[in-house]
Every structure is written in structure tokens, then in C-alpha cells.
Amino acid sequence: MKLHLVNDEKIINRTIDIFEEVFPGENLFVVTNRTGAFKWVSKRNNVLSRSEFQKSKSDYTFSELYIHLLNRRKMDIINTLSLHNVAVYWIIWGLDLYNKLLVPKGFQIFAPTNSSCRQERKPWNLLGLLKRIQQRHEAEDTISFVKDKVDYIVTDTTDNDYSYLLKYYPELKDKIWKDFFYYPLDVILGPELIKSTVNGTNLMIGNSASATNNHEYVIDILSKLDIGNRRVIVPLSYSGKKKYVESVVRLGKELLGKNFEPLLDFVPLSEYNKMQVSVSVALFGNWRQEAIGNIIVALYLGAKVFLSPVNPVYEWARSHGLVVYELERISQQDIDTPLEDIVKLRNREILSSLYTKERMIRLIKDLVE
């Protein structure tokens, strides 16, 4: 039996389906959120809440344990289990690596202009200081857990996450790396987008209201260019704090005027897809691995994608031959000139070869071989 510790996230239903397709009847998924009710994960016979699992765990024998995003709750569960002859896999999601482990060691995820963290960075802010001390202690505990309990480090899409982990924590160099991804390209795109290409000249900033999008940083860069009457679409309807969203909207209106178009409410998928197809320039201010699905969609559709070179995704994309551009060096010509057709085709071909269902199944099988 293969035990999967997961969060209550949309992606997990697809994860259940694909692991069951590869290993039918061999998987048990435990949703580790605090409550027993699930918002996104569909209840099935092989899906348990945390409390249900705690009551029945003695009924199961496991050969593998998969941690889909490492956090304290999952570590607590694992610490109650016997791991004799159990192979333990940590599948990195991004937050668990960059925010929780690399930031306490000095990795920067926020641009200096990011309003969400200006206050706590002030030297006299005791709360900010205490938070940083706590983060360091939590990181030390997590690394100790990984050293003692984890056998394999698994990266989702961006394989250089593993090298970043070892750069900051060389004591984990004996942990074996495995490759993996959650979604094949046809699922990422959906039936509408897989047949589409860019047909507009709009711009898009980021993928959510998460402060790690560094929206204000991107808006400031973009404000120095002449964007004419093009729309600057900024998705802000989920995954962010109210004060941060308000700050982004305020600055966007101030610097970009009527061109600035924040998406503050849920947009139906068909309408959002039309927006994505209208975007010829996609700007991502993230300094950590994030928004990879949105980046893949933009590249597939034929948009020019701009990333900060401090973002590990920039390095990853270029290592696979994908054409991406440096955000900090964006020019007027860059936004006025569409991506060449030969480059659009090449990006699409690379993504189509990387993210096939067949390759995903092979990687899942390779996890245990």
C-alpha cells in the first residue's frame, strides 16, 4: 500500500486519479487539514480525513509514503508511524522549500518595493524579529526531520529545486532526487486553450494575489514604458491578503491609469481563457518557484514571458531551451514586438514533449524502481 499525505487542494483529485491509474487499488490518501470536511478533495473509499486515519492506521501496511507538500501536520502524523521498510518521498511544492526552508537561510522572495513585508523588515519591529527567529527554528526542525525520515527528494516540474535545497542545506546531499509532475499538458491547458494561440496585445501581471508575485515591483517596471491603450490584466481574486491587494490596486491605478485592470472577483473559466489568449506579454515578478502552470500556458500560447533571473524558474526554463526574457531588462521594443513564429513553435514543441501523460506515468513508475 502507498500512503499519500495531502492537502485539501483542487490538484489532489487529479493526483488520486493518476496514481490509481498507475497503481490501481494500492493507494490511500489522507487529507491532513484540520477539519474533517473537505472543500476540494472528493470523498472516496481510499480517501480519509486525518482523524479517520489516526483511528484506523493500524489496519494498514505501507511500502511507500508520499508527502505532497511538507508541513508540520504531516510531520506529526509521520512521527506516529513505524517506517520500517517504508520508502519516504517528499514531493516539493514550492512553499515548503522556498518560504519555509530557504528564506530563513537568506533566500529573498520579496522585492524591496513589496508592501506586504516593509513593516516587519524594520529593525525596531520586535514582532518581525521574533517571527524570523521562529522561522529559523522551524526550518531546523524540518531539516532534522528530512535527514532522519525522508529517503527521496522529488521535484514537481522544476528539477533545479533540488540543487537549491542542497545549496542551502548540503547536509542533505545523500538524499536521492526523483523527477515528477502533477499535470500533463492537455490537463493544464484544457480543451479550449490547447487549440489556441495568442491573438491580442494585452499584458498580464502574475497569477494570483499572493504577495510573492511582487506585483508592485512589476508595475513600477512597466510604468516606465508606453503601453498605449493595451489592457494590463492583474489576477487578484484569490490567495492574498486584503491590505496587500488594496496596495497593489492603488499603485496600479496611480502608475498605469485606465490601462490597469485588476481581476478582483471570480472569472468563469471560459472568460479567463479568452483573456489569456489576448495576452502577448506575460510578466511574473516572483523571486521563487511559483505560478509554473501559468508560465507554461503563456509559453504554449505564444506569449512573451518575462521572469526575474533571480527566480529559479528562469534558470529552469532556459536549461530546457525555452525562450523567456529578463523582466528587469524589458524594453519598449519587447512589448511592441510579438514573439517570432519560429520561437512560438519551438516553445510549444518543447512543452509538448516534456508534459505528456506517457512521460508522467513513466516518472510515477520510476519513483518506486
Label each region the model flagged.
Residues E246-F266:
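Nucleotide-activated donor-binding/catalytic signature segment of Leloir-type glycosyltransferases, i.e.
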Residues D334-E369:
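A charged, aromatic-enriched C-terminal amphipathic alpha-helix characteristic of glycosyltransferases
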Residues G94-Q135:
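Acceptor-binding helix/loop patch of EC 2.4 sugar-transfer enzymes
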Residues L193-N213, L222, V232-V234, S352-S353:
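Conserved donor-binding/catalytic core segment of Leloir-type glycosyltransferases
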Residues K274-W287:
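Acidic donor-binding loop of glycosyltransferase active sites
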Residues S56-K74, A87-W93:
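Short N-terminal targeting/anchoring amphipathic segment
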Residues K10-R14, S210-K224:
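A conserved mid-protein helix/loop that constitutes part of the nucleotide-sugar donor-binding site
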Residues L130-I176:
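A short, active-site helix/loop in glycosyltransferases that binds the activated sugar's phosphate group
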